[in-house]
Every structure is written in C-alpha cells, then in structure tokens.
Amino acid sequence: TTVFDSLAFGTSFRRPERKAALAPLLQGLQEAADAGALRCDHFLHARCEVTDPETIPVLKPYLDDPRLRFMSLMNHAPGQRQSPDIEVYRQRHMADMNMSAEEMDKHVAELVWRAAELAPQIRADLVEIGHGLGIPMASHDDETPEHVAEAGSEGQVLSEFPTTMAAARTSHELGLVNLMGGPNAVRGGSNYGNISARML
C-alpha cells in the first residue's frame, strides 16, 4: 500500500509556519519509516505554488530525496482558477487572515502582480525540475481549456480539481486524468462554489 503525503512548498498566504513545519514533518516521517512504524510506503507529493518566489529554494534541498515522486503546480492568485471572483476571495479570507480591508487589497494586488510577473518563470523552472527528476506532474484548479492545454504542452499528466466543466472536458480530450476531492463529492460542491465532483 502506498500513501502520498501532500506537503506545500511555497504558499500564496502569509503563513510562514507552513514552511517552518516542512523539515520537521519530513524528518518525522523518515524516522517513523526507519523505525518500522509505518504500515505502508510513504512518498512525497510536492505542492508547488508558482506565485511564491521561495517555492524553488524551499524545494531544492529535497530534489535528491527518493521519496519525492509527484509534483503539483498551483496558482492560487485571486481572479482566476480557484478564485475567479476577487470580491468573494476578499470576503472569504479577510477574517481568516485577520486583515483589514486595506491590508487585503494590498495582499490581493501583490498576488495578482506575482501571478503576472513571477509565476510564468517559476512554473517553467518547476516543469524543468519535474522532467529532470522523471516524476509525473499535475496542473491544479484548471479553469479554462487554455489552462489545460498549457498543462498538456508541459507534459503534465493529471488535472487536479478542474473548476469548470469546460476544463474537465478538455482535460479528458487531451488525455490528462481528472482528479476531484472526496469532500467535494460528499458535500455535492466545491468550497469555492466551483463545479461539483458529482457532475464529472
């Protein structure tokens, strides 16, 4: 039996504790494996945020780790993909992130800028890393056929959580596997109001 532990390398939120927790989590998993305490094989699924300039530096120490077997390329900037409605994003995250309206506006503007100016190169570098390692890669929160076509052209094999029927259909047509979340199927809909897994 195999488990893929999905851990974030980079984040679109100002939550440094996620990065701080990464090394202890991976060390703990390795110690448990070495002690024979795990009942199945644990491999690493690297969830890579393309809007974060720290993603690749955080990932680099683990590129030779034999547990690294899968990579997702994520873009959680508002205005597209998971969060096409910026106002919904603002209202959803203001309380969660304990920000004022002005602080949230600055946060949104920064993420939108990162998505436009930084993400394309970070994404290209991650694709190169994935191919160099010979591991499968997944796109994430594909919203449009163009998102899926980009993923296909980069050699990605899986579309995680397509957010629209158009993206899911294009993924199927291009030979990418669609993956939806169990909670979405149980609830009958996405947390963000995107397409229900039951429709696919």
Kindly give the residue locations of the regions a language model identified.
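Hydrophobic residues within beta-strands of alpha/beta enzymes
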Residues: 5-7, 71, 159
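A generic structural signal for ordered alpha-helices
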Residues: 7, 37, 104, 108, ...
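Conserved beta-strand edge residues that scaffold enzyme active sites
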Residues: 6, 11-13, 77, 143-144, ...
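Metal-coordinating catalytic core of metallo-dependent amide/deamination hydrolases
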Residues: 12-142
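Active-site-adjacent C-terminal substructures of enzyme catalytic domains
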Residues: 44, 136-200
